[in-house]
Amino acid sequence: MKTKGYAALSAKSALVPYEFNRRSLRPRDVALDIYYAGICHSDIHQAREEWGPSIFPMVPGHEIVGKVIEIGSQASKFKVGELIGVGVFVDSCRICSSCLAGLEQYCLEGMTGTYNALERDGKTVAYGGYCDKFVIDEDYAVHVPQNLDLAGVAPLMCAGITLYPPLKNWNAGPGKKVGVMGLGGLGHMGVKFANALGAETTVFSHSPSKELDAKKMGSVS
């Protein structure tokens, strides 16, 4: 599948237009037109090789939202025309205890990153969401409600996913208290999630100017 995007050709280069081919659909794959791809600071770290050696050319982007345009012969979770989200990983071993428990992010063999990674065959480079099309196994994508602002949904695929699991793991809800350290890109989502779950939420911050915003989002203090 011919795809147009933007890539870093080296750790010192700016992003430049880049064309490449997505894989042909496997039986359980879905293909999507990308509508939005958020910019995460980790994209910059990886493109600049600040977290270790990177794979170039690199097409960054792991906060992806789009519309399904094609499905594989055995795909059943999505229909053409539905909205879909893709986050920070696109595959895992599927057989370890973590994967079997639905915790693929903790795959004992290591999950496959959305970009700057090799797919499970050990040779195919994974390209991210700074482009117009994407192909992914349906088990590693999520449904997106039709009534949401897609520009706001894209960051949920990273920042939102980062905050939600600990709240779920500790059963945040009515009768529970949640403390959020800082009210930045991650913190504000933590406040909103905890408040929506019914927990009593407190923000800890060095910036008194953020108190009003915190309370508007549902923090009690």
Identify the role of each PLM range:
Residues 3, 82, 175-176:
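Nucleotide donor/acceptor-binding cores
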Residues 21-22, 55-61, 121-126, 132:
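Short Gly/Pro-enriched turn/cap motifs at secondary-structure boundaries
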Residues 23-37, 50-100, 105, 145-147:
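Glycine-rich beta-strand-centered segment in the early N-terminal region that forms part
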Residues 42-48:
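Cytochrome P450 core scaffold surrounding the K-helix E-X-X-R motif
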Residues 146-221:
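Mid-domain Rossmann-like dinucleotide-binding core that forms the NAD(H)/NADP(H) cofactor-binding site
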